Amino acid sequence: MLIVEVGFKLDKPLEYYDKILKMNGLANVFNCETHDIYYTKYDLNGLTENEMKQQCIRLRNVNFKEGYKVENKLLDSLNIDFISEDEIFEFESKLKENGYLKVFDTKKKDHHYCKEGMSTKVQLQEINDIGLLVYLDNDNYYELSLEEQRNKLIDELNSYGFDFKYTDLGLDKLRTLYYKEEKYSKNQNG
C-alpha cells in the first residue's frame, strides 16, 4: 500500500499559519526541535524522496536531549539503537569504514496541530535552509488511490484555512537539500 503525504512550502511567517489553524478550531498540541543526520553509500541521483530516505541511515535527536536514535539500519553489523553526542565521531568512523558518508545534516522545528476527532496532526515545520512547510497525511485515506489520497489531504488542509489547488506540488526536503535547489512532486512520501 502506497501512502501519500503532502508537504507544501508556505510564504508567510509561522505566526500567520498558527493563527489560521487556531481560528479553524485546531490547537497547537506539540512542539519540538529535531536534528537529523543522514549517511549513505549509494548514489541518490534520480531517486524520489522516499527512495532517498530508504538509502540512508539516519540519526535523529529530538529537543537536543541525551543523544541520537539510529534509524534505518542498513548495515548488518550496526546493532546500535542509540548513540550519545560523545559517540558520534566513533559511529561516523564505523560508517565510513563501510563506505557511508554524511549527505545531509538538517535541523527543524515542528509544530503539531489537531482538534478533537482528528486521526492525524497538521504539522508546520520550520526547516533550516528550506523554510516553512505544512505537512499532512491521514491513515483514513490509505485505502484510496494515490490521487484520491492527495486530493483528500488537500481538501482537509483547505478546510483548516489553507488555499491549495490539486495542481500544486509539494516540496521534497531531501531532494531539495541534495540538489541545492527546490524540488517538487505530488507526494512527499513517494
Question: What is the predicted role of each segment?
Answer:
Residues 1, 11-17, 129-133, 151-156:
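Glyoxalase I/VOC metalloenzyme domain signal
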Residues 1-119, 163-190:
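N-terminal strand-loop-strand beta-hairpin
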Residues 23-25, 74, 130, 139-141, ...:
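General N-terminal targeting signals
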Residues 57-59, 122-124, 133-134, 156-160:
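Generic hydrophobic secondary-structure signal
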Residues 78-83, 134-135, 145-147:
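A short, polar/proline- and glycine-enriched secondary-structure boundary/capping micro-motif
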Residues 104-143:
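Conserved, surface-exposed functional patches that form binding/active-site neighborhoods
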